Amino acid sequence: LLNKQNMKPEAYTKKMAKAFNIDSYRKGLSTYTDCVAHYAELVECCYTNLKPNTPASSPYGILFNDLMVFASDMDKNELRILKDELNQYYSLKEWLVKNAFSYIAKIISKIEKYFPAMFYGVTEEHTCPHSNQLYLVTINDEEVNADYSSGYEVIEKILPIVVALENKLSRGDINAFEDDRYSMDQFMKLTVGMRVKALQQNDVLKTYFLNSLNNKIRNGETHDNSHYDSEHQICRYIDFNNPNNMVEIPLMDVAFMTYIQFIRIMEIALVVNKILQRIWN
């Protein structure tokens, strides 16, 4: 419903009432933007309950928290100008509603399949492969590879905007890359793979997107170049750059990487929603 700009709030509330199996749903949702804000509240609730138990000061929390403060405190006129600049790279609203919300709903609908992988988040073990493997099978290789590939594409679309926001936050200008070889126009001309590679020059983004933008998994799924060893629970991917080389990742590590990717998508969605809601209201 949120994909339709002319959607009636009454239709949204009825849909939500049916989804939650209740007679009536929240009143006071009178506009399309109210409904988007409400859906974002549901995302925030899911995020709060599913995020890893890591301190806000950790490398995994710094960027998200700083961007939320940045979006909350910026002068509204300046924020509106920034939004117009960002929309050159991808529509914030379209990404939020059509890409992020849809992907989040899909993963939430089967989140129990990822519960074992979340253990690594609880123990703050973010580096893959993990030395202590769980050897549990709550999701198969085909499904987790497909989920990871889908999440990769969701992040891929919003990546230029996250880069621009980090530039603005850290250095005061969307074109001020940590590696001064780039501007946003130059970054946009890069292939997706080269954009991901360029992130390695930025310590903040490199750490933030750790595990979320693995080209080997994505290419293995996209080009049907992956194999599964059920005996050892290992996913094997043909290296796109070196076809004679196989990349091995334990199944539960792929699930953990997909879970972290999912967390990142929720965080970016909350930042984008904060920007849009301040401008809309």
Could you tell me what each predicted segment is?
Residues E41, C45, E142-N167, M257-E267, ...:
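Short, hydrophobic/amphipathic alpha-helical patches that form generic packing surfaces
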Residues N145-S212, G220:
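Flexible secondary-structure boundary motifs
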Residues A11-A17, Q186-T191, N281:
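Amphipathic alpha-helical surface "interface" segments used
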Residues C235-N281:
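Amphipathic, Lys/Arg-enriched alpha-helical patches that create a basic surface
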Residues E124, L165-L169, I238:
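Amphipathic alpha-helical scaffolding segments
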Residues K206-C235:
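Histidine-centered, metal-coordinating catalytic motifs and their short helical/loop contexts
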Residues L1-D141, S212-L213:
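Extended intrinsically disordered or low-complexity regions, especially N/C-terminal cytosolic tails and loops
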